[in-house]
Amino acid sequence: MILSKPNYIKIYGHRGARGDLPENTLESFKYLFKNNINAYETDILISKDLIPVITHDFRLDPSFTKDNEGNWITDENIIIFDLSYDELLKFDVGALNKLSRYGRRFVNQKTLENQKIPKLSELLELSSKNKSENLLINLEIKSTPDEENLTPTPEEMVKLVMKEVNKSNLQNKIIISSFDWRTLTEIKNLYPEISRAYLSFQQQAGIKIKNTIYNRSPWMSFLPFFEKYELPKIIKSQGGKAWHPYHKDITKKLVEISHQEDLPVNVWTVNEEYDMLKMIEYSVDGIMTDYPLRLKELCDKENINWF
């Protein structure tokens, strides 16, 4: 697995290519590979019958989920972990409700018919057909220390995910990430050969994502934390292979400190051209974006090496 190359940017399709095609669908990942984008980030939850599935939110999102009669769902509390995989198959996730707040963010996303939430095993089977040396699969395990009964325990989740990873023979192409560092500790203890990336988010005005980085944070497995410049060192001390921060949380100095620790920096989720150029100026190693083709075209236009 090639995480970084000097003077190159690694392009990751975020949830496939969410800006262009329905997120976390097999068609979205096929689209990446057809366009020579060989790295992606995706999300894993667990169904009631303990099948790892590819979806981001703990609950079905009414913004892009239809029932088996073709109607947008209205219930915002349908928990993935409460449904068997057969029950999940009754829902279609191939379109965005463009009237929803979420839908208005991705007005150019194409609609696809009959798109189901995939199993992790299906995505890995698809990925195994990509023979590029640059193939890199970032599996984010969705887990939370804040709310119970949304997932199995971190240990159980890790074992279920790794069962599929080991069947795929893609171990050397996979890096597992999580905001919930308890999950990464389980990977470290049970599967030390698997690379781990540590996700982080520090509160930004106007963004409704929970701050995960603070002293004795449960998201950080209660590790001590006093100031932002020590975060790369903390991650390195945990055996992390990469740091995955929110792109507005970093500075050029933080990237330099991370590189001094031999820790690649892959930022999320960068969709605007000026932010892409800023991240490249900061010398990050990888950029996760909902518009990977946009980033590829920008790199080509600016004579920036990418892989």
Where are these regions (language model features)?
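Phosphate-group recognition and catalysis centered on beta-loop-alpha active-site segments
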Residues: M1-F307
